[in-house]
């Protein structure tokens, strides 16, 4: 041994065990402070031995061998060995101070070999050397079902398989072997670094205690403790699964509505060109269109404002009354007014518009419906109007059109400020600003759609009769955003021509959330107590993104509830678990299952009967994946029992012994021993002054604290 320091104890620690149990990894973790990744741990095993001469070659390895244990300076020298049974290891065993007998927690055969093969071999060459039983790869006791761990085995040879639950050695099984052999038991993991330093510190203690029994005159070893108890390893809390949202199709839906307009209710005439559009979208993008379409065309008065851009000709009270009538789909109050208005043209005092009128047209189903016709002034060219409409629907412009001045003039008259800013960024070549402006425009339009169409109910052309009320909607947006609605309004169903559609089994709260998604591609906050109806409706309409958004909102609500001291989050998860699977909300079901597993003890105390009412597969999953797992709870109870017994042993007795010591042979100590021997059936009693460090390393007559940890 090189570079011995004065007043330093040299401890030779021999590491033995079957091949591929993790001996060399354990030594490298301690001697070289080497941390390994999961991919490195799962590489194909190549038998190796860590060379002992590294203490002489590498200074940092030598310095890491120095350690202070219980105020004793120690230099720990680790000896690696081959795991083959037929190898001759007598040289490695020579002058060893302690032996680590290793096995793999994922290989029960390696534990059996510890008792059958390795322990007899150690005792043959080292009859008095202390032994520690070490379980390696402790991390695989909980990682064997981890998705990251399992993914490494999918693309490998079929002859290489991942660890299964049946392969695992539980702590009580290994401790039973340690108790049978009369040795201490520890567990380690070079992946999590659990127990690495602890096992070597306690191996040093075991070696120093054995050395103290042989060299009783060495005062520096008096305070060395017995190997300490190892706190059980608690697996990390399972991470809640993340919710993955289906890709948004909102922009594609709006582009398709622009490219193939259906259920249009307004026609714009610019020169010799006509453009079909939808009043709700035009009003959401442009305040001037909103004011135009909100006019009461049956009124006989002319516009009151002298401003060219103003088209509000009625008082605010009359406008509010007409908005209420619009929201109930009474565009024209009476049949007489309808007859007067259809075909009648109203001239407008605005630079962008000449006149507006309402006429009757036949839709694709042959049903007559009112159509608003707006004639544009010559200041807005057909090409500029086409670009403005394209921007309103899609948020983008045609790059092939280069006359930006015409578009700018039309945008000013139509009050499209976002389009003006986009044109400015195009002229200055600020593409990144252009992208931000488009994103901001889409947010503004969606917010305006929600306000105009959902809150005020303007420009609707269909009404849904629900269980607790009626809600207006717009066929064009429903058709573009939902394939089921598209089939209903476009096919040979009676709903395609109906003004009122009966929708049984749906309440107004649920349908409003559905419309929020269809119009804005977002879902407002949802209570976990009221989400099932919306999940059922979204699944019925084949809206997977809506299902994902509802899952995300409900999980946010459950996370908020879980921070409270009550059991409301657990109760809601238990209530949602199985219905979520029924409605294909699998991500929410997985999150609820994870939350129930983490709070399994609270769940059983709260409502054990509800757990028994779950589907047997769900009950089995909860029992299998509960956290903390059963083996940890058993190990923790054993650890607490050992600590309690250790405290009782170290606690001084309350009864004070009489001091009967005397001079030489005239003392009463011999009589006291004789009486104690008689009272204990011939067994020698331990005096109260005996310290834990003076007791043997392992007492096979005791059951816990003195045995395997």
For each predicted feature, which ranges?
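Eukaryotic beta-rich interaction modules
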Residues: 7-12, 29-63, 75-85, 112-116, ...
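Beta-strand-rich binding-surface signature
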Residues: 8-13, 18, 24-25, 61-66, ...
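Long, low-complexity intrinsically disordered regulatory regions
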Residues: 37-47, 52-55, 217-261, 297-364, ...
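BTB/POZ-protein C-terminal extensions
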Residues: 438-477, 487, 498-508, 530-533, ...
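TRAFAC-class small GTPase G-domain
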Residues: 1-211, 247, 259
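N-terminal BTB/POZ boundary and linker segment
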Residues: 216-277, 390-409, 413, 417-475, ...
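Canonical BTB/POZ domain core
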Residues: 267-269, 273-276, 282-416, 463-472, ...
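Post-kinase regulatory C-tail/linker adjacent to protein kinase catalytic domains
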Residues: 139, 163, 216-230, 303-309, ...
